[in-house]
Regions:
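A conserved short beta-strand
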Residues: 563-575
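Conserved Rossmann-like nucleotide-binding pocket used by diverse enzymes
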Residues: 171, 496, 569
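Core-facing hydrophobic residues within beta-strands of well-ordered domains
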Residues: 189, 286, 539, 564-566
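Cap/lid segment of the alpha/beta-hydrolase catalytic domain
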Residues: 133-147, 159-165, 179-181, 396, ...
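Beta-propeller folds
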Residues: 1-393, 399-405, 409-413, 430, ...
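Residues forming the Rossmann-fold NAD(P)(H) cofactor-binding site
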Residues: 551
């Protein structure tokens, strides 16, 4: 495994392994690099086989040596980015019952501090109820999970990963006396839902393959071994997650893969913990639910009836069968519904149309709609309904590739918004110094591929460019603000996002046409975008960047068209696809 020439990277030794899959013989010379006990490695990296560790260390040493000349500028850029981040900051307080909750970051503190104050008091009288920095001290590695206050606001369940394995442990704290309870729940996905009576909580347990596979209930004061298993998913291709309706009446168990879903609910107002099925899973049919308490109905977001970009349906909460579902917000092709929420008086719907997001507010009394839009050519938009079902306002989060995050308070009745927080850049920032642009490249089959571009107004033509792409799992890449990106753009680079097929920027068809047998479209779209930027004299010397499934995109693009690109960054690339899946 030693390099033949010190100017070349270490060469992994070859050891042929053959196996048959679907009557085809597959050959792999590097099978030995994949440790068979990877589940143990996730829990404890030190058990990685010595020959694999040796090769990884050799690669890292060679890389560090070759890139050592970049250390000075790396340090400069790190300091530069750090100066642009406001080290001491606070989030917007969110009301939950008789309390307001918020977080703060402090200088030289790695993690946030969680604070709260009584609703009739003021922020000046707030108290710390959870300090992630304090909790991290006993561990060499620490990653915060979530913090979930009980319905009576007396208890806090919090989760963390102390090994880097993404198996989260859950602990419980008494918020009245600040003492930790003995409860300790291991191997979870990090999220919980409290029971209404605060006597315990629901959680998802991960199996040895890191799959969230089982729903449990934990009664406070008992050992994890005594926890009740409520549901176990036998199909290894499906995953579980839990949430609760904003009304808090129902715990929601979502069972899903990347294209099919099934929902089961528990009525939290009843003593038994019996799961009730909404409708059985059916291949390629997805749905999710919310509860409308005033109208005793469930609202259902689904792609049923060939509504590939989704529609909103409704059914009486006591008549769950699919035959009782009726359209509430009918299907409109080309308008993708990405999210929705139900409050006491309003339904909030988030949509994506022509690659741009918008928020639609529906008055439940008369079904009148109000559309919230913004004026920039490209931007990112999101909303948060808060913790309270009875709320008459929402938070709106807006940013663009040039505009730092703006938080709006939006009054649903008055249809008025006001800025309540602006993301501060301590070194200063003027969005007017930048040009934003949405352009379209024509791919091999005539499809128009959107490209979001930002550059300084004084950047000349044919500038060096970083082109980013992902194009997998239906994930849309938002043209949002990034502090670190400024260090490239302010040095004269163009930054571009290729919204290729495999994402969902132009609806569900956009996703379907970039997966499985259509996956080649993702790669061709990406190469087309790079060629377009050169042809239009926007770019020269294009560096491409993608991570995980986006790393597959980078690897494939380099192999198909190596001369198109100047440099490539494949971050944790998922490039051994068939071996992994098969």
């Amino acid at each position: 495994m030693s390099p033949v020439n010190k100017n070349y990277p270490p060469r992994a030794r070859k050891k042929l392994v053959k196996r048959k899959v679907h009557n085809k013989e597959l050959s792999d010379h590097f099978d030995w690099i994949r440790d068979n006990n990877w589940q143990e490695v996730l829990h404890s990296p030190s058990v990685l086989k010595k020959n694999i560790r040796k090769y990884i260390d050799e690669e890292n040493r060679w890389t560090n040596k070759k890139l050592s000349f970049l250390k000075p500028i790396e340090k400069d850029i790190f300091r530069e980015i750090k100066k642009k981040i406001k080290e001491e900051d606070t989030s917007i307080p969110q009301k939950d019952g008789n309390w307001f909750y918020y977080s703060e970051t402090k200088r030289n503190k790695e993690y946030s501090i969680l604070r709260r104050y009584k609703s009739y008091s003021s922020r000046k009288k707030s108290c710390i109820y959870h300090d992630w920095n304090k909790e991290s001290k006993p561990y060499k590695y620490f990653k915060p999970g979530g913090a979930f206050n009980s319905n009576n606001h007396s208890l806090l369940a919090w989760s963390f990963d102390s090994k880097g394995s993404e198996f989260y442990e859950i602990k419980v704290k008494d918020l009245n006396n600040k003492k930790q309870l003995k409860d300790s729940i291991k191997n979870t996905d990090g999220r919980i839902v409290w029971s209404l009576n605060n006597e315990g909580f629901y959680y998802i347990k991960m199996d040895k393959n890191h799959r969230p596979s089982s729903l449990y209930f934990h009664l406070l004061g008992t050992h994890q071994d005594e926890d009740i298993e409520i549901y176990n998913e036998k199909d290894s291709g499906y995953f579980l997650n839990i949430s609760e309706t904003l009304s808090k009446k129902y715990l929601v168990l979502n069972i899903h893969n990347h294209e099919t879903s099934e929902v089961r609910i528990i009525n939290q107002e009843e003593k038994n913990k019996k799961l009730k099925l909404i409708t059985k899973r059916k291949k390629s049919i997805e749905y999710s639910i919310e509860h409308d308490q005033e109208n005793s109905r469930l609202l259902i977001l689904t792609n049923k009836d060939n509504a590939i970009d989704f529609k909103l349906m409704e059914t009486n909460e006591n008549k769950l069968s699919k035959k009782n579902w009726t359209d509430f917000l009918p299907y409109r092709e080309g308008t993708l519904i990405t999210n929705f929420s139900c409050l006491a008086q309003y339904i909030i719907v988030q949509e994506l149309e022509n690659g741009l997001p918008r928020i639609v507010v529906i008055n439940k009394k008369n079904n009148k709609k109000n559309i919230i839009k913004f004026d920039e050519e490209i931007y990112d938009l999101d909303f948060n309904e808060g913790y309270e079902y009875e709320s008459n306002k929402i938070k709106i989060y807006y940013s663009s590739m040039a505009t730092p995050l703006l938080t709006y308070d939006y009054k649903l009745k008055d249809q008025k918004k006001r800025i309540i927080k602006k993301q501060q850049i301590p070194t200063g920032h003027n969005e007017k110094n930048y040009n934003l642009k949405r352009v379209y490249a024509i791919s091999h089959d005539g499809e128009k591929i959107p490209i979001s571009i930002i550059k300084r107004k004084d950047t000349p033509k044919n500038a060096p460019t970083l082109l980013y792409g992902y194009g997998s799992y239906g994930i849309s890449i938002s043209p949002s603000f990034s502090v670190s990106r400024l260090s490239l753009i302010d040095r004269g680079m163009v930054y571009a996002i290729a919204h290729i097929r495999g994402g969902m920027e132009k609806g569900k068809k956009w996703y379907e046409n970039g997966k499985k047998k259509n996956k080649l479209n993702s790669f061709k779209d990406f190469i087309t975008c790079a060629e377009f930027l050169k042809k239009e004299n926007i770019s020269k010397n294009i560096t491409i960047h993608g991570g995980s499934a986006g790393g597959l995109l980078i690897g494939a693009s380099l192999n198909i068209s190596p001369d198109t690109f100047h440099c490539a960054v494949a971050e944790v690339p998922f490039v051994d696809v068939l071996n992994t899946i098969l």
